């Protein structure tokens, strides 16, 4: 990537950046874009100019969150781990292996972590998927909340074949989630302190394709990466906008930039720059790793 990529980012056109990269878990933090590449077991950062920096990891990372202490929480298959971010960022990741924090569903070897992020209170909320996924696969995936204060708590949500699209309303009281093997996005009432969910209900049903990653903007609208398109939904579930994309295998949309008004969509073929239509994102809550 070079200066041309930076100009394209400012222009807000649907253009692929780093087309050879598998961009998963895309998010904005500390004035940089960050993502993981599950295929190469690496974490990347990019300041929207020049080449991205890369740190190889012992295992593939499917989700991650930044911590209040400056560390990063990594989701690696069956484990949540902590890793240090040295100065400059990523310098320390390759030198010391991540430190395991908690095993996830160790009695069920058929699952692995598939998606996750922090809720508005700084807890890490994530889901699992069947490790060997096929269309209409077995629904053995679950949803969890992790914090240092309470440890790992399972959320009382329906099992899924592949958990995706985990995100939260601006006030943190509604959780959105989806099963990538189904054509629907669901929502529920969410109590972060008690790790309690209630009133699970349909948010949106897809006519075609499958829902993957999602994010919520400052106006409470949900942006969903689906099979070859990005869809924006109103808080009541009405589809407001649908933009086709050249990549079928989309991963996650994210807002970034100094004003959180730049919209990128990760995919198995790089990042796609989109016109957000004036929408702005919300900053990710930092994982609270200082509570005991």
Mark where each language-model region is.
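Blade-level signature of beta-propeller repeat domains, shared across WD40, Kelch, NHL, RCC1
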Residues: 254-292
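Short loop/turn segments immediately following beta-strands, especially the blade-tip
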Residues: 85-92, 188-195, 276-281
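A short beta-strand motif characteristic of beta-propeller blades
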Residues: 12-17, 50-56, 99-106, 151-157, ...
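A short loop-to-beta-strand structural motif that recurs across blades of beta-propeller domains
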Residues: 42-44, 79, 141-144, 184-186, ...
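Hydrophobic alpha-helical segments and helix pairs
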Residues: 90-156
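Short loop/turn segments immediately following the C-termini of beta-strands
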Residues: 38, 77, 129-131, 180, ...
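Short, solvent-exposed loop/turn segments at conserved positions within beta-propeller repeat blades
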Residues: 38-39, 133-141, 180-183
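Beta-rich, blade/repeat-based domains predominating
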Residues: 17-32, 58-76, 106-123, 157-174, ...
